[in-house]
């Protein structure tokens, strides 16, 4: 019986390690006009009420929310929840933000969530030019 238990434990460990090795973060798909268009439609359907038409966090109910919705018009590198990283924005859309009004959107397909990522990043202000010395 001890040998059988060892085989079961070893097999379970192997399956766990294999599953962990195969699990990977989703990679961003290539940004295409079609994907961006899809993201803009999803944004209008699901995000405008809080984040506003311009992505400035000034939607119809945005001012009533605490904390205020994210302002996507700041430079992408300055976003609190993203800091210039598309995967971080994808994670926020997928998982939401605890203790805020930002709900998870995991019910959307992976492609739809990436489409939303590209749509909200479109609102970002361009990088400030670097000063020459």
Predicted ranges, named:
Residues 34, 40, 44-67, 99-101, ...:
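Periplasmic/extracellular electron-transfer cofactor-ligation site
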Residues 21-42, 131-133:
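Electrostatic cytochrome c docking/interface patches
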Residues 17, 112-113, 124-127:
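A short hydrophobic/aromatic micro-motif that marks alpha-helical segments and, especially, helix-coil
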